[in-house]
């Protein structure tokens, strides 16, 4: 068992428990959705494992960091939905560019000028809704850039 502290109160969990479980326990105390944990003053994603003895607070979609995390998740959801619904042939070499925020939204476009028709947009929207309902975790991994250069360059 490990102990984590929220508002000075200890909570005990099994060794392999994620912050998400603690967030779910405490969510009724929050008006808005919990999207990040602050662990000993450092931001952590909810899918990370609880550290024994840590002091935890939570950020919701009402905080600046929470809004940024939420937007990043929505962009990743959009990218997955595009990959699932629009053929490789149709996408070609187009990449999605997220340029800036508009009010509470984001301005996104394809860098090579691809324009989706109304039916394709509906398919992407439906795919995003299905993915959201499936509630898949979004996990961030850091990969050393030296791993990118293990193969000889085509110019060699």
What are the roles of these predicted feature ranges?
Residues 37, 138-140:
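Generic structural motif
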Residues 1-75, 80, 87, 91-105, ...:
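Ubiquitin-like/PB1-type beta-grasp interaction modules and other compact soluble beta-rich domains
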Residues 100-104, 142-148:
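A glycine-rich phosphate-binding loop feature that marks nucleotide/adenosyl-phosphate handling sites
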Residues 114-124:
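Extended, well-ordered alpha-helical scaffold/bundle regions in very large, multi-domain proteins
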Residues 122-138:
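Conserved glycine-bearing catalytic or ligand-binding loops at nucleotide- and phosphate-handling centers
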Residues 103-116:
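Short His/Asp/Glu-rich catalytic/ion-coordination signatures at enzyme active sites or charged loops
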Residues 149-156:
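Conserved small/polar residues in nucleotide/adenosyl-binding loops
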Residues 49, 70, 120-121, 151:
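Short acidic, glycine/serine/threonine-rich loops at helix termini
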């Amino acid at each position: 068992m490990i102990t984590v502290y929220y508002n000075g109160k200890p909570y005990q969990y099994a060794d392999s428990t994620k912050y998400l479980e603690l967030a779910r326990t405490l969510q009724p105390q929050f008006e808005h959705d919990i999207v990040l944990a602050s662990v000993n003053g450092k931001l952590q994603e909810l899918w990370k494992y609880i550290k024994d003895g840590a002091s935890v607070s939570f950020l919701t979609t009402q905080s600046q960091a929470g809004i940024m995390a939420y937007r990043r998740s929505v962009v990743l959801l959009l990218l997955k939905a595009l990959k699932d619904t629009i053929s490789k042939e149709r996408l070609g070499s187009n990449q999605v560019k997220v340029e800036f925020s508009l009010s509470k939204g984001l301005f996104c476009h394809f860098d090579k000028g691809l324009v989706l028709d109304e039916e394709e947009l509906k398919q992407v929207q439906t795919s995003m809704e299905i993915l959201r309902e499936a509630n898949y975790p979004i996990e961030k991994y850091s990969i050393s850039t030296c791993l990118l250069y293990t193969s000889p360059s085509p110019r060699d």
